[in-house]
């Protein structure tokens, strides 16, 4: 069928044409934001899940609705090896300038910009990647000590006073939050805790891989009471069918029942893969309805494209030792797998491969669902490892 009218949208954080099965989490976030703005107790959210489940899509949709409803929105994505201040400062400045232009700005709006200026100066000394050329002035003695935990709490307190005065709330959206260094993560959690204690309207909506739950608890023990951790998983079968059928129906295209069943089987109902299969089914099929044979042919195309992009970009970041570790996991199946079983397959002691396991967790390739267990963070990655490294025995 015509590729120009293909409705499916596989992509990193691309909102699909039909955001099916996620109404409950969107409503949960909306309630939390409204309660925060109204001065009521509310917990932030950490959306937790594997790659390809649509965490970034949800953050984007929630942030769009927040901005449309008058919230002050700050969005950051936390790549590896960037400091939290370097990521926060530019986006906070933009949000504060918008707040300063709102009605009832008062002296607090000017003051908080000066406080941010002092924070910038202090962080430039401590973190080499903080680069900010605009002079905002400073408010001597506030958020300028150089101690991140103290200064971030002071900065957020001043911001909270402004948002409270203007009857709004600052919503901090943080994607890939698991990459924040633990000491900096602790400072962020403490700053938000301080705001919650003082009923100041600042709230965090974050997203990350499953290890985020443990990371937050290690950073600050009270994080479990400050945030909720909804799990974002594959879609239900009905939602998965809706994600495929609704966009197609707008162009009068239908799927045969067994064709839909085959897509759900191949994708395991993961949102990203549903979009990928939908795209290739549309492009392969000659006409409506899309048949089982169309899906089987499209499956080969979808897997080939995933191997060349979605999977490959992650594989290319790995060292030879890390590739062997993941290939051993794949040999055992989709997981989870005991560290001892992986080590035995690699013909090594558990302690010998522990550093490799640690770096793979740090890179976001695997996580530990329970002590001593290991699972892939990327769905279907075990199949890819077998395709890209087909002969496990030749690794030795």
Predicted regions and their residues:
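C-terminal leucine-rich, beta-strand-based interaction scaffolds used for sensing/assembly
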Residues: 5, 43, 258, 296-300, ...
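Amphipathic alpha-helical "lid/sensor" segments that cap RecA-like P-loop NTPase cores
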Residues: 122, 240-309
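Short regulatory helix/loop adjacent to the ATP-binding pocket of P-loop NTPases
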Residues: 211-227
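Walker A/P-loop nucleotide-binding motif
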Residues: 41-61
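Conserved catalytic segments around the Walker B and adjacent sensor/switch elements
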Residues: 63-82
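Conserved Walker B catalytic segment
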Residues: 139-210, 218
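Conserved P-loop NTPase mechanochemical-coupling segment
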Residues: 107-153, 157-165
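A short, basic N-terminal segment
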Residues: 1-43, 394-396
């Amino acid at each position: 069928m015509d590729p120009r009218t293909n409705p499916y949208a596989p992509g990193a954080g691309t909102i699909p044409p039909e955001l099916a099965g996620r109404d409950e989490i969107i409503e949960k976030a909306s309630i939390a934001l409204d309660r925060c703005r109204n001065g009521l107790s509310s917990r932030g959210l950490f959306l937790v899940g594997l790659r390809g489940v649509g965490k970034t899509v949800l953050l984007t949709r929630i942030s769009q609705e927040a901005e449309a409803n008058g919230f002050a929105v700050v969005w950051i994505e936390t790549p590896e090896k960037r400091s939290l201040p370097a990521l926060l400062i530019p986006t906070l400045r933009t949000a504060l300038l918008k707040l300063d232009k709102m009605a009832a700005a008062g002296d607090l709006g000017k003051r908080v910009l000066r406080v941010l200026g002092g924070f910038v100066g202090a962080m430039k000394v401590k973190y080499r990647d903080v680069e900010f050329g605009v002079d905002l002035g400073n408010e001597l003695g506030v958020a300028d000590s150089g101690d991140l935990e103290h200064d971030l709490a002071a900065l957020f307190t001043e911001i909270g006073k402004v948002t409270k005065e203007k009857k709004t709330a600052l919503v901090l959206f943080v994607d890939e939050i698991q990459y924040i260094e633990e000491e900096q993560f602790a400072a962020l959690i403490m700053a938000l805790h301080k705001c919650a204690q003082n009923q100041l309207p600042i709230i965090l909506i974050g997203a990350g891989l499953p290890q985020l739950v443990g990371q937050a608890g290690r950073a600050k023990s009270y994080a479990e009471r400050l945030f909720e951790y909804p799990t974002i998983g594959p879609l239900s079968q009905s939602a998965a069918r809706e994600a495929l059928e609704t966009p197609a129906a707008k162009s009068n295209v239908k799927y045969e029942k067994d064709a839909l069943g085959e897509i759900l089987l191949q994708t395991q109902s993961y949102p990203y893969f549903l979009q990928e299969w939908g795209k290739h089914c549309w492009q392969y099929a000659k006409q409506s309805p899309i048949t089982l044979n169309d899906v089987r042919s499209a499956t080969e195309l979808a897997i080939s494209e995933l191997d060349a992009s979605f999977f490959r970009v992650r594989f290319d970041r790995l060292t030879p030792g890390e590739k062997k570790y993941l290939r051993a996991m794949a040999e055992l199946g989709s997981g989870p797998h005991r560290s001892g079983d992986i080590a035995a397959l690699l013909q090594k002691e558990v302690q010998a491969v522990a550093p490799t396991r640690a770096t793979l967790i740090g890179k976001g390739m695997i996580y530990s669902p329970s002590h001593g267990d290991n699972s892939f963070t990327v769905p279907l990655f075990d199949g890819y490892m077998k395709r890209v490294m087909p002969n496990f025995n030749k690794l030795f």
